């Protein structure tokens, strides 16, 4: 599992700003989504997790739009996104999130594959 190294910055008041990362990926990988939040947090990232991983819950179209809007706001607020792409799988929603992050010039890191630009690219 690739975990990117965060770069914290010192603020004028002496406090530290930890970089923010949004986790993206299919809810079929619930265990991996939960595990990666812990790994990223321990590495020093402030993590926005996937908001809903309970596949048994029925979500109507209006709620899907709301949840998508919230997730896009997480991406805009973040310094980067982290894609849980177990066995190379990236579904349609996750692909859309990657494109959205790229539109906002956010670096994209992959659980399997490292960084989008190839830096620190390593496989577990």
Region spans (language model):
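Conserved catalytic or regulatory cores that recognize and/or transform ribose-phosphate-containing ligands
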Residues: 1-124
């Amino acid at each position: 599992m690739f975990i990117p190294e965060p770069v914290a910055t010192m603020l004028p008041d002496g406090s530290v700003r930890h970089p923010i990362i949004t986790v993206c990926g299919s809810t079929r990988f619930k265990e991996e989504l939960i595990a990666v939040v812990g790994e990223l947090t321990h590495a020093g990232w402030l993590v926005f997790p996937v908001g809903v991983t309970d596949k048994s819950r029925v979500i109507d179209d209006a709620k899907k739009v709301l949840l998508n809007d919230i997730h896009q706001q997480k991406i805009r607020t973040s310094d980067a996104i982290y894609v849980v792409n177990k066995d190379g799988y990236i579904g349609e929603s996750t692909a859309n999130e990657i494109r959205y992050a790229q539109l906002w010039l956010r670096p994209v890191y992959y659980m399997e594959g490292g960084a989008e630009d190839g830096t620190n690219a390593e496989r577990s």
